[in-house]
Structure formats: C-alpha cells, structure tokens
C-alpha cells in the first residue's frame, strides 16, 4: 500500500464525519450515519447538532454500528463567554446521549485579554460532561491567528481539563492549518500527551491528511495518533479518501467542510 493510501485509510479511522448545516434534517443525519460505515471501515465518530443525537443513535444501532461514536457541539459557533449557557448546553448534549462534546472556547474574550473566562468555561463544561464523555475544545485558531494566542488558548484548555484541542468550527474563513497544528501539538507534547488534537475544516484530501499525520508523528511519535488522541473533523474529505483507496468517485465541484 502506498503512503498516500496508508494516509487515506488512517484518516478514515480517525474521522469525525460531520454535518453542521442550518438545513440539516433527520434524513440527512440518517444518510450521514450510513456514510460513516465506509467500504474501508467505520469512521471514529459522526458530529451533528444535539437535536439529531436520538435519531443518529437509533440509526447506528439498527446498522450494528454501535462503535461509531456520536459527537455534538455546544457554545457553537461563536464561542460566547457566558459560562452558564455553555454548561447548560453541554449538560443537555450529554442528556441527549452524546459520547463527545465539541465546545467552542471564548476566543474573542482571549483576544481582548481575558484568560480567566476561557479556563473557567472549559473547566465547568468538563465537569458537566461527567464520566466517559470526551470534551473537545475548539479554539478557532484561524481567528486567533497570532501564534502566541493559539499557544495560550491551547495551554488554558489543557490546564482546564480538555480531552482534545480542536482548531476550528468550520464556520470562519480560515480553518485547520499546518502552522496552527504545529503550535497546538507542540503544547500537547509539552503539557500532556494524553490530550488529543483535532484539525477541522480545510483538510481536503489524502495528501493533506498525510501532512497532519506526519506532523503528529514528528512531534509526538509514530504510535501517538489513535482515535483517542487524533481526529479529523470533515465532511467532503471522506469522498476523496475513498477515491484514493479506489473505493469511490472523487468529489466534484466546490466542497464544504
């Protein structure tokens, strides 16, 4: 198997197959569940809005795909600094049956010089997750832009108990970049290598996925990236990975997240 095909296979195993669109419906989420069971194996998870968790759980169970985890989003997409609302949303997501919660860090507050609210929000949301539910924190690196802010946000999230740090919501012009990934995974290497990393949005094909996986191997070791420590947040990426593996047609036209 070529390096490109190896990257494609690994990226599928590490994927949070995502739909977070305003026009999402039960039917679209059912279709997403079926896409997550690929000819190359199951994706790690699907990522959907909280209201669709029950239909997704029912569908995955009917498919015999209980191992595909269900992730959802809270404080999304704007990363507001109201801790109480973020906690209520996170509790509701867990009550719906989420296995993982992707919460948006209050990145604008950090840009304005407030480090405390982000730390406290992540800490409170981690407590709201309880046992067994992973908390992934989206720092919106493409808006932070400044390497010092990306580093600070990553440090605050890890110190507050995040299970993963994630680049992006996919709702802003700049999403996952190799530059941001290097800063974020460097912080993981310094602070706690049990914390995971999730590049989201903008990873378009096997070559790009391979670049992120190669960076992870260089910074954290060849064996580090597993579904417990590395995810790709993506929607259109899957089509291109299956094409690389000669298991489907390439994506046509402009593609989303």
UniProtKB/Swiss-Prot annotation:
It is found in: Cytoplasm. Keywords: Cytoplasm, Lyase, Schiff base. GO terms for cellular component: cytoplasm. Its main location: cytoplasm. It catalyses: 2-deoxy-D-ribose 5-phosphate = D-glyceraldehyde 3-phosphate + acetaldehyde. The keyword RNA-binding does not apply. The active site is at residues 102, 166, 198. Pathway: Carbohydrate degradation; 2-deoxy-D-ribose 1-phosphate degradation; D-glyceraldehyde 3-phosphate and acetaldehyde from 2-deoxy-alpha-D-ribose 1-phosphate: step 2/2. Coiled coil: none annotated. Its EC number is 4.1.2.4. The keyword Phosphoprotein does not apply. GO terms for biological process: 2-deoxyribose 1-phosphate catabolic process; carbohydrate catabolic process; deoxyribonucleotide catabolic process. InterPro entries: Aldolase_TIM (IPR013785), DeoC (IPR011343), DeoC/FbaB/LacD_aldolase (IPR002915), DeoC_typeII (IPR023649). One of its GO terms (molecular function) is deoxyribose-phosphate aldolase activity. Belongs to the DeoC/FbaB aldolase family. DeoC type 2 subfamily. HAMAP family: DeoC_type2 (MF_00592). Catalyzes a reversible aldol reaction between acetaldehyde and D-glyceraldehyde 3-phosphate to generate 2-deoxy-D-ribose 5-phosphate. This is Deoxyribose-phosphate aldolase. It comes from Shewanella sediminis (strain HAW-EB3).
């Amino acid at each position: 198997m070529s390096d490109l095909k190896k990257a494609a296979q690994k990226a599928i195993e590490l994927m949070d197959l995502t739909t977070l669109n305003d026009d999402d419906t039960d039917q679209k989420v059912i279709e997403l569940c079926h896409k997550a069971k690929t000819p190359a194996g199951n994706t790690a998870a699907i990522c959907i809005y909280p209201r669709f968790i029950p239909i997704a759980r029912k569908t995955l169970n009917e498919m015999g795909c209980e191992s595909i985890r269900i992730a959802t989003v809270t404080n999304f997409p704007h990363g507001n600094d109201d801790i109480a609302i973020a906690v209520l949303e996170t509790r509701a997501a867990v009550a719906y049956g989420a296995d993982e919660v992707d919460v948006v860090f209050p990145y604008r507050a950090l840009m304005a010089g407030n480090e405390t609210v982000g730390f406290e929000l992540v800490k409170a949301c981690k407590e709201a997750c309880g046992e067994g539910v992973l908390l992934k924190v989206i720092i919106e690196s493409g808006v932070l832009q400044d390497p010092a802010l990306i580093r600070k946000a990553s440090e605050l999230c890890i110190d507050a108990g995040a299970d993963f740090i994630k680049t992006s919501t996919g709702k802003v012009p700049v999403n996952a970049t190799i530059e941001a990934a290097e800063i974020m995974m460097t912080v993981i290497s310094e602070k706690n290598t049990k914390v995971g990393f999730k590049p989201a949005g903008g990873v378009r094909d096997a070559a790009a996925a391979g670049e992120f996986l190669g960076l992870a191997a260089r910074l954290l070791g060849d064996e580090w990236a597993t579904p417990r420590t590395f995810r790709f947040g993506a929607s259109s990426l899957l089509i291109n990975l299956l094409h690389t593996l000669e298991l489907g047609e390439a994506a046509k036209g402009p593609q989303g997240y």
